[in-house]
């Protein structure tokens, strides 16, 4: 409160911009709450229709190496082998490209970052006229925290917790009690 007006805006449920504030201008820092599914579909449509991107839906089943050890292509379950100039590993903790192909070990930070597991839910509003929170609500729990993000059509609620200090069953109970 002593260094920023953001705290006051948040607790009063106010937006960080006024109707007269120009696009992408701001008086205080802010971020947008986005429906990840709708945003992904928007990006897919924009890239395919406007940028000429070819969108393929497939699971990567293997990596084909070039002679120098780089990735020449990836093998997929339904699209065959796909060649590209750039591959981004989106396989999560499986680390198919970075870990399995290149041998890059996961760099654990569990000694300082305890929260390693998350549960998430999409919760509809009780009624269409329910207020949408202007900020992410964060609520401390026994071994983590719950986030509550208001979106136009629903709330995104999740529980991030330490699996060393809480069981999935207990974390689920805490999340359901919050909801």
Language-model segments: what does each one mean?
Residues 1-33:
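Flavin (FAD/FMN) cofactor-binding and adjacent substrate-gating region
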Residues 21-174:
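Predominantly flavin-linked oxidoreductase catalytic cores and closely associated redox partners
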């Amino acid at each position: 409160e002593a260094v920023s007006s953001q705290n006051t805006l948040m607790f009063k449920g106010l937006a960080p911009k006024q109707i007269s504030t120009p696009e992408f201008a701001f008086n205080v820092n802010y971020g947008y709450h986005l429906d990840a599914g709708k945003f992904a579909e928007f990006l897919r449509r924009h890239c395919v229709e406007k940028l000429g991107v070819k969108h393929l839906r497939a699971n990567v089943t293997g990596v084909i190496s070039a002679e120098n050890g780089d990735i020449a292509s990836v093998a997929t379950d339904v699209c065959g082998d796909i060649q590209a100039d750039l591959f981004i590993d989106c396989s999560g903790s499986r680390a198919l490209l970075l870990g399995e192909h290149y041998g890059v070990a996961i760099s654990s930070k569990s000694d300082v970052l305890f929260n390693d597991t998350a549960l998430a839910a999409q919760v509809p509003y009780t009624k269409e006229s329910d207020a949408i929170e202007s900020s992410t609500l964060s609520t401390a729990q026994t071994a983590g925290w719950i986030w509550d993000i208001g979106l136009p059509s629903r709330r995104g609620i999740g529980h991030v917790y330490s699996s060393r200090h809480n069981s999935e069953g207990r974390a689920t109970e805490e999340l359901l009690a919050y909801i």
